[in-house]
């Protein structure tokens, strides 16, 4: 339980630190989401390397996405993804109905615009993990009602 609280506090401090540096002119305001996503990318690469060192090879893309939704998500966020959908053409939608990093935000409509700040790191986390498993992707997130969110993963064919 303590490690979960530390992760949530660290994540909140990363977000506020990046946005404070933008206010002080150290970083362009438009680059904040990119910076958070880059941090998540590097963390995702490292975590996947550690989590998969003792697992068998994945047989296909869908197997990798199932690993991300079950094992990876459970380790990082203490629960599995609630729903995984695919069109079998390289697009996957991961839905989390109680996303841990959004739970501390108020559920009012006025806070929806701030949600993207708190999702950028996780988009990078997913993209970094997939990258280390040999899958190049674009990951976006959307929130229609708090604290539920959907991550869309578009696989880039080489």
UniProtKB/Swiss-Prot annotation:
Similarity comment: family membership: Belongs to the TRAPP small subunits family. BET3 subfamily.
InterPro entries according to UniProt: NO_sig/Golgi_transp_ligand-bd (IPR024096), TRAPP_component (IPR007194), TRAPPC6/Trs33 (IPR037992)
Protein name as it appears in the record: Trafficking protein particle complex subunit 6B
Pfam families xrefs: TRAPP (PF04051)
CDD domains to which the protein is assigned, alphabetical: TRAPPC6A_Trs33
The entry's keywords: Endoplasmic reticulum, Golgi apparatus, Neurogenesis
Designated gene of the protein: Trappc6b
GO biological process: endoplasmic reticulum to Golgi vesicle-mediated transport; nervous system development; vesicle coating; vesicle tethering
Subunit structure: Homodimer. Part of a TRAPP complex. Heterodimer with TRAPPC3. The heterodimer TRAPPC6B-TRAPPC3 interacts with TRAPPC1 likely providing a core for TRAPP complex formation.
Superkingdom, taxonomy of origin: Eukaryota
Tissues expressed in: Widely expressed. Expressed in lung, heart, liver, spleen, brain and kidney.
Any one annotated GO CC term: cytoplasm
Its job: Component of a transport protein particle (TRAPP) complex that may function in specific stages of inter-organelle traffic. Specifically involved in the early development of neural circuitry, likely by controlling the frequency and amplitude of intracellular calcium transients implicated in the regulation of neuron differentiation and survival.
Cellular compartment(s): Golgi apparatus, cis-Golgi network; Endoplasmic reticulum
């Amino acid at each position: 339980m303590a490690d979960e609280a530390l992760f949530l506090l660290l994540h909140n401090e990363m977000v506020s630190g990046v946005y404070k540096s933008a206010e002080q002119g150290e970083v362009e305001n438009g680059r904040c989401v990119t910076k958070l996503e880059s941090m998540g990318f590097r963390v995702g690469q490292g975590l996947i390397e550690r989590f998969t060192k003792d697992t068998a090879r994945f047989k296909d893309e869908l197997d990798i996405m199932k690993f991300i939704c079950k094992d990876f998500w459970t380790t990082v966020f203490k629960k599995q993804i609630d729903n995984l959908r695919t069109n079998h053409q390289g697009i996957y939608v991961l839905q989390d109905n109680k996303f841990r990093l959004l739970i501390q935000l108020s559920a009012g409509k006025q806070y929806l615009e701030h949600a993207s700040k708190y999702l950028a790191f996780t988009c990078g986390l997913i993209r970094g993990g997939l990258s280390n498993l040999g899958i190049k992707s674009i990951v976006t997130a959307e929130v229609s009602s708090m604290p539920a969110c959907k991550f869309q993963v578009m696989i880039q064919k080489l």
